[in-house]
C-alpha cells in the first residue's frame, strides 16, 4: 500500500498513524502541493491535486481521508477497527470525528487566507471567524472527553483525529487569536505521542 503526501498535512498524518496502529505495512511517498513537479504527479493519483491519496495493494486509488479510513477499517475488521461496530458508539465517534474534521478544516482555511493573499487583501473578520470555529470545535470535543481516551477505556478514531489535529493547530495558530482551552486533549496528545504510531509520524511544519 502507498500513502501519498507529507506528514506535515494532518490529514495525511492521520492515515499514517492509523496504518501503524493497525500494523499494516505501507510506503509513504511525500508529495507536496506546493511543489509544481510533485503536484503534477499527485494529480495522476488524485484529480483534485490534494493529499492524502492512497493506493491499495490491488492498485485501487482512494482519495479523501475519511474514505481511506473507511477502507482501512474494513480491511482490518471490526475487532481491530478504531470505529466501533455498535450503532450508538459508532454514531458518537463519527460525530466527534466530524467536529474535529471541521475544526481542522477551518484552520487550514485560515492558513490559506494568510498565505495565499496579499496582506492588504486579507479579510480580518473572516479570519477571526475561522479561528473561532476551530476553537469552538476543539473545545466541544474536549468537553465531551473522558479518560484515558475520549470515549473511555478504548482508543478510537476520535482520539487519533484529536491528537493529530491538535498537534497541527498548535503549530500554526497565531498568538493574537484566542487560545484553545482543551486541557483534556492536551493531556491526550502528550500521552498518545509517547506511542510510536504517533511519534513516528510527527513532523514540524516548515
Predicted feature descriptions by range:
Residues 69, 73, 94-97, 138, ...:
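Non-transmembrane alpha-helical segments in soluble domains
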Residues 1-124:
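GST-like domain detector, emphasizing the conserved glutathione-binding G-site
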Residues 100-190:
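GST-like fold's C-terminal all-alpha helical module
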Residues 80-85, 149-153, 178-179, 199-204:
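Short, hydrophobic secondary-structure boundary micro-motifs
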Residues 135-138, 143, 193-206:
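Charged/polar, low-hydrophobicity segments characteristic of intrinsically disordered regions
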Residues 9, 87, 156, 182-183, ...:
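Serine-centered coil/turn micro-motif
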